Amino acid sequence: MANPKNTESLAELKNRFADIDSVFVTEYRGLTVAQITELRRALGSDVQYSVAKNTLIKLAAKEAGIEGLDDILTGPTAVAFIKGEAVDAAKAMKKFASENKAFVIKGGYMDGNALSAAQVDAIAELDNRETTLAKLAGAMKGNLAKAAGLFNAPASQVARLGAALQEKKEA
């Protein structure tokens, strides 16, 4: 007979896997409760950071259609369930890992693909969505100004040529 606590935990994990955009898997061995609380605060409201049994995580992930996590689900494991922007969560986790050597990012899952620890680290190096859109808008604005200058240039050149011809004719 299944343990009721495990059954409840499995149902909760299934719900979390069904309602997320990406997942990062970490090892929390050696961290204090205060440090884990600090990490949860740094991750923000779009991320649920949970400690769970590897077996339950594997079962819930499999039922949610998420594959490729089995290799990294060893040892004491905590999972960051991310709804929305994964870049901000990756940045927060990378910063936390640099300040707390006991914290290890094992990998994750995003857009139908399993991620290695190096890939999660690479995600942390990306700009978030707002920054990328701001850069794109700035680049477009600059290019539009250049284009307007190019379109106006022939007209002004014709006007200068006309003025020069008129001066030459008068002389």
Swiss-Prot record:
Tagged with keyword Lyase: no
GO CC, alphabetical: large ribosomal subunit
Keywords (A to Z) from UniProt: Ribonucleoprotein, Ribosomal protein, RNA-binding, rRNA-binding
GO terms for biological process, alphabetical: translation
GO molecular function: large ribosomal subunit rRNA binding; structural constituent of ribosome
InterPro entries: Ribosomal_uL10, Ribosomal_uL10-like_sf, Ribosomal_uL10_bac, Ribosomal_uL10_bac_type, Ribosomal_uL10_CS_bac
Pfam assignment, any one: Ribosomal_L10
Function: Forms part of the ribosomal stalk, playing a central role in the interaction of the ribosome with GTP-bound translation factors.
Subunit structure: Part of the ribosomal stalk of the 50S ribosomal subunit. The N-terminus interacts with L11 and the large rRNA to form the base of the stalk. The C-terminus forms an elongated spine to which L12 dimers bind in a sequential fashion forming a multimeric L10(L12)X complex.
Family of the protein in this entry: Belongs to the universal ribosomal protein uL10 family.
Protein name: Large ribosomal subunit protein uL10
